[in-house]
Amino acid sequence: MSLKHYPRIQLAQEIAKALRGESSISDAPNGLFLAAPRRTGKSTFLQRDLKPELERLGVVVVYVDLWADKKRDPALLIAQAIGQVLGEHLGHVAKLANKAGLKEIKVAGVLTVDTSKIGQVDGLTLAQALAKLQEASGKPVALIIDEAQHALTSQDGEDAMTALKSARDQMNVSGINLMIVMSGSDRDKLMRLVNNNKAPFFGSNITTFKELGPDFIAHVAQLIEAEYKSFAPLDRAALMAAFKAFGHRPQFFIAAIGQSLSPLTAPEGVRFEDALLQAGKDKVASEEEQMASDYIGLPPAEQVVLWRLLEQGQKFRPYDAAALAFYEEKLGKKLTPAQAQNALDGLRGRNPSMVWKSLRGEYAVDDAAMHHWYGVAINDGAWPPRGALVSDVVAKKRPRK
């Protein structure tokens, strides 16, 4: 039984059609921006479904994950990904040129290729490199950038986004020669690529990536029933409920299936579907307990600044008058702008980082799942977490019943 990959062929075909301008109601030719929580199958889909489908249609695809190496500048990762694919195509042209005894050849009557420098993109802008790739291959190009919001953390990264927008405008004058797909695991961060007139792709829309649903559950159920016939028929609705409990995250769901089927770890006297549902609830509870533990372990200043960030979201301003008043109320003492900045720096410096910062000084929680955790705690009247240093101050200010 293999649950490693569930192909989403129809979705890949629909997106490819939209990117190629074959859908009259889609703005995808101007750029497709997909947002989905971590671990919900977005990256797998881009690499194993969308990329092959575009290639099947005769499109040259460049894929780059900006989280592949967070220590390297995002712009460098993008340039190297383009350069690698460009080198592959120019290498083919070079072989043809060498066989003909030529030092230089022209591709499509326009592009001059120096065969002694094949694969090198030094001195080329991103727009020029993409144009050369399209001309050398004779095919349209699709650039897929995973975790694209990370580009906004450096000047070169932000400049690269602006350059890609320019490349799109230049290359698509006479048809769709450059398709751009950008994805992110945090909608709020990805939104910063499009949400104001200073954003590189201002005016574009963020699309929520479709979660795996009943079709995926039916696929999983059929595989299990084929190998474990005593389990048939499985309750699809119960399996779907369990998958939802895992936050629609296939990796954790499938791992729990393996544990529930193993004679070494399967719970006794519990229906398979119920065991999965409980495993999903336990997984989320464990993650939330870890978030609470991490929060409780912070110094008071970092606790209160993170609280403000969770409460305000994109409206967060670290040291405006309202923020400083908030800090004083929750801490029981004043926090200066410099102290608030030190708290933010401390949150960013933790491993893993708890706060993300863009080049323009915009802040967000690093793990978007914290927003859900915070919202649930607020609704349950369980905020701040018991044991947090700021909770003592808040408790003292609450009126006694």
Question: Can you say where each PLM-predicted feature lies in the sequence?
Answer:
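Pre-Walker A adenine-sensing motif
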Residues: I9-S26
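Conserved catalytic network of the ASCE P-loop NTPase/AAA+ motor domain
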Residues: S24-S26, L133-S137, D169-I176, A199-F202
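P-loop NTPase nucleotide-binding core
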Residues: A28-L152, G157, L178, L335-P337
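Alpha-helical sensor/transducer elements of the RecA-like P-loop NTPase core
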Residues: T44, M179-A226
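Conserved nucleotide-binding/hydrolysis micro-motifs of P-loop NTPases
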Residues: A68-K71, H150, S185-L190, L212-P214, ...
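Sensor-1/coupling segment of RecA-like P-loop NTPase cores
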Residues: H150-N196, F209
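Amphipathic alpha-helical "lid/sensor" segments that cap RecA-like P-loop NTPase cores
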Residues: H219-Q290, P300-A301
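C-terminal leucine-rich, beta-strand-based interaction scaffolds used for sensing/assembly
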Residues: A285-K401
